[in-house]
């Protein structure tokens, strides 16, 4: 009997969050280990489908770095990275677009639909969903100055066609977006999936942005998880060496999204089963929440 009571208590804990998020939009960046482990893939699919069944508009933006690396290797194309960004020439861009839109996107959509969802795959080129311009990466020179470097067909999102996403949401569909953008002349751009998720969340004025990662969240210098960060503390935490390395662009993405109108953003551990539900429907969550 006790375990039944505990289940009831869990449902009651979720109730205020269900009320809060019903009719609102949540944007989830799906990537990392959660995309390769079968149990985690199923867990993620069921989480997203449950959110949609509760009246929560859920938008998925996926990555695909490992799949791109594998295919480039098969084609004998060697990748170069500048500050974590893949240098993307025309040949590399062809592979990136093929893998993200023709392979990974279809796999994610298929998995959601297989488990009872109504997912629709999109790339940023569909309906000019993600209008982009070339992103010039800043690189520190020997004298300490910053120089902007052209790294090929790598894009920054300048406009999101939110009407396309909202049309799908109103039709009870789950939009699944591949991070390939389009330029003014129709050229394709490789766009960081975290950046896409943040821009989409900002355009939709989402209630929450969630980034799935392969770490617990933001940790302090003692290695302990920081459950919450307010916006004003972010510069201090970066300058103080608490937020470092690859976590800096993720946190910056969350900050930018909040500045664009997103209520809250979370960086969570995608290696945890049902991490999305635990983050949204429990009092403590499973990662680091960033808020005003």
UniProtKB/Swiss-Prot annotation:
Catalytic reaction equation(s): N-acetyl-L-glutamate + ATP = N-acetyl-L-glutamyl 5-phosphate + ADP
Protein's cellular compartments: Cytoplasm
EC numbers, comma separated: 2.7.2.8
Keyword set includes 4Fe-4S: no
GO biological processes: arginine biosynthetic process via ornithine; L-arginine biosynthetic process
Free-text function comment from the UniProt entry: Catalyzes the ATP-dependent phosphorylation of N-acetyl-L-glutamate.
Protein name: Acetylglutamate kinase
Organism for this UniProt entry: Geobacter metallireducens (strain ATCC 53774 / DSM 7210 / GS-15)
Gene: argB
